[in-house]
């Protein structure tokens, strides 16, 4: 199964989700993208530090969401605005959900961009729990 996590710039939330999910779902292809990413831009320093401290894979450069990405098995966005944009731009989007929606949780994953390391750590911990729920849903 190919899963794509999507956020705004692909420098904070979706790279964290990608790394966490790769560690929890090693038999699946997991990548991340940004709706407004600048291809090749480095991920945020706080994201990189948090992932390295936990010995997780670090996706070092941002990648934008492209037309070929719509062919993934599952597309999980960090917020409803990302989901809405994908659904407006592409056909056949029954496999596009917010991450929270897909695992039956209320809310969205907040953007820590520009915040302190502790703000990023909060998002990491939230994503870790959401991806535990994702793993349970996929494997059961």
Curated annotation (Swiss-Prot):
One of its GO terms (molecular function) is protein tyrosine phosphatase activity. It catalyses: O-phospho-L-tyrosyl-[protein] + H2O = L-tyrosyl-[protein] + phosphate. Pfam families: LMWPc (PF01451). InterPro entries: LMW_PTPase, Ptyr_pPase, Ptyr_pPase_sf, Tyr_phospatase_low_mol_wt. The active site is at 7 (nucleophile), 13, 111 (proton donor). Gene3D superfamilies: 3.40.50.2300. Its EC number is 3.1.3.48. Keywords: Hydrolase, Protein phosphatase. This is Low molecular weight protein-tyrosine-phosphatase PtpB. It comes from Staphylococcus saprophyticus subsp. saprophyticus (strain ATCC 15305 / DSM 20229 / NCIMB 8711 / NCTC 7292 / S-41). The gene is ptpB.
């Amino acid at each position: 199964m190919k899963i794509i996590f999507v956020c705004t710039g692909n420098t904070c939330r979706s790279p964290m989700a990608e790394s966490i999910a790769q560690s929890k779902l090693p038999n699946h292809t997991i990548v991340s993208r940004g709706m407004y990413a600048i291809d090749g831009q480095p991920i945020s320093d706080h994201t990189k530090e948090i992932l390295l401290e936990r010995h997780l894979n670090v996706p070092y450069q941002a990648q934008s969401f492209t037309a070929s990405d719509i062919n993934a098995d599952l597309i999980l966005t960090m917020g409803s605005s990302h989901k809405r944009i994908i659904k407006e731009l592409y056909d056949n989007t029954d496999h596009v959900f917010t991450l929270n929606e897909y695992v039956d949780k209320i809310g969205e994953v907040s953007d820590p961009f520009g915040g302190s390391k502790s703000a990023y750590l909060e998002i990491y911990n939230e994503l870790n729990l959401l991806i535990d729920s994702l793993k349970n849903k996929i494997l059961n």
